[in-house]
Swiss-Prot record:
Ca(2+) 1 binds at D81, D83, D85, E92. Belongs to the CREC family. It holds the Pfam family EF-hand_5. This is Calumenin. The modification Phosphothreonine is found at T65, T254. The lineage of its organism: Eukaryota, Metazoa, Chordata, Craniata, Vertebrata. PROSITE patterns: EF_HAND_1 (PS00018), EF_HAND_2 (PS50222). A motif (Prevents secretion from ER) lies at residues 312-315. The gene is CALU. It comes from the Eukaryota. Ca(2+) 2 binds at D117, N119, D121, E128. Glycans are attached at N131.
Length: 315
């Protein structure tokens, strides 16, 4: 599907969404849950497996023998030990957990990378991205499908330049990831806020007032009463979003809204795994300590079978 087809589809989806005025649009970027399992090690280590590996990868370990599981875990530990000092710290484990949870992002980047690295030099320049994404627009600057492609291209170029740390208009894979998924990078958060404000700020005064805030998430349907969640959002705006009580949100207030400082579940899980596995209590883990507790980190056919026995007995 090319960009034109995608945007036409997006237009239809948008129109469909607007026809459902009680549906709420969520602009807030939350950290994803580490697992949808209950975190209760007395019952099972399923939560820990999902957190450490990601839910999909965790399923593959359930098919392995204990020996295979330990061998594969040992290889993972070598990747987690970023400074190669033979130990895994809480910070290294936290970084790994965050990577495992966001593996889908890197898979998305890999898919898009192949379509934009046109000269296959391991980099994506702005020219390559522009030509691959907007090439036909340059040939036909006034398409009749209602989208302002030039404006979209200007916005993309601004974001590309922000992601491009060294300013050479050529993105490494990490910079390209920041371009495609800016909410995942601290240095890109200002552009996320700026783009959000541009989307919502209809009168162009550089702020988001109450009506713009509500109008972005709710399309009023004639004489129908507002749903309760809209009334709640009005109260949220007045009581919490508009911190200085001037009737509108500035950049900092918008940032606090869409990029909240959530509880760091990855760090909490990393500390839990270290605490449970650290046999000599030195605050860090060796490969041997991790592999000895393989059932906590990754599981196998044996741990899965044991869990099944527990559930059968309970039944």
């Amino acid at each position: 599907m090319d960009l034109r087809q995608f945007l036409m589809c997006l237009s239809l989806c948008t129109a469909f969404a607007l026809s459902k005025p009680t549906e709420k649009k969520d602009r807030v970027h939350h950290e994803p849950q580490l697992s949808d399992k209950v975190h209760d090690d007395a019952q099972s280590f399923d939560y820990d497996h999902d957190a450490f590996l990601g839910a999909e990868e965790a399923k593959t370990f359930d098919q392995l023998t204990p020996e295979e599981s330990k061998e594969r875990l040992g290889k993972i530990v070598s990747k987690i030990d970023a400074d190669k000092d033979g130990f895994v710290t809480v910070d290294e484990l936290k970084d790994w957990i965050k990577f495992a949870q966001k593996r889908w992002i890197y898979e998305d980047v890999e898919r898009q990378w192949k379509g934009h690295d046109l000269n296959e030099d391991g980099l994506v320049s702005w020219e390559e991205y522009k030509n691959a994404t907007y090439g036909y627009v340059l040939d036909d600057p006034d398409p009749d499908d209602g989208f302002n492609y030039k404006q979209m291209m200007v916005r993309d170029e601004r974001r590309f330049k922000m992601a491009d740390k060294d300013g050479d208009l050529i993105a490494t894979k990490e910079e390209f990831t920041a371009f495609l998924h800016p909410e995942e990078y601290d240095y890109m958060k200002d552009i996320v806020v700026q783009e959000t404000m541009e989307d919502i700020d209809k009168n162009g005064d550089g702020f988001i007032d109450l009506e713009e805030y509500i109008g972005d998430m709710y399309s009023h349907d004639g004489n129908a009463d507002e749903p309760e969640w809209v009334k709640t959002e009005r109260e949220q705006f007045v009581e919490f979003r508009d911190k200085n009580r001037d009737g509108k949100m500035d950049k900092e207030e918008t940032k606090d809204w869409i990029l909240p400082s959530d509880y760091d579940h990855a760090e909490a899980e990393a500390r839990h795994l270290v605490y449970e596995s650290d046999q000599n209590k030195d605050g860090k883990l060796t490969k041997e300590e991790i592999v000895d507790k393989y059932d906590l980190f990754v599981g196998s056919q044996a741990t899965d079978f044991g869990e099944a026995l527990v559930r059968h007995d309970e039944f």
